[in-house]
Amino acid sequence: MLQVNLENEIKRLKKDLSRVEKKAVPNAAILSINDTLKLVKAGQQLQMKRKLENPTNFTLNSLKIFEANKKTRSPKGRIFIFRRQEEYIKYQIDGGVSRSVKGGFPVPVDRSLKNRFGNLRRGKTRLFRTKKDFYADINGTRGIWQRVGKDNIKLRIVFSDQNVYNKKPYDFYGTGNRIIDAHFNKRMRIYIAQVKKFMK
């Protein structure tokens, strides 16, 4: 979850405002936070497309915005990932180890089966049901093996009980904070200027 609570930033902006302009700050802050959250959501979806492997619409639509309102002492809003999607997206954000409930994770050993993310290329499982490819547990290694020549075999895919995520390709928090830093103050000044113009 990424929370947008810019109380200190709002206080800093108020120092340079007139008494009339300061009255506009609460509403301007709410509007600015909500505008910025929409930009954060769009930016996160763009990052998903760039950093995740062929994200589905289910993944791209995983973000929920809670808008700022007048109910809190200081305006704040937040954006988070729905729980179902967060169960697998979290490994792309924070890394870690996921454990298989059943069957194991298919991990490609053969480089020809890997995509640019190092994962099994889509559709490749259909290639294993050939005369040369077979499933076996050999010396404790479960996987898809291939017969090479008369007497040799090679491991193409290993089934692992856990998947270790060392890389963290999706910078969820960094992306959100960069967008907030780039856009919030601009929108605050725009809304305050509109109020000032209206009051003249």
Residue ranges of each PLM-predicted region?
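Short, Lys/Arg-rich flexible segments
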Residues: 1-200
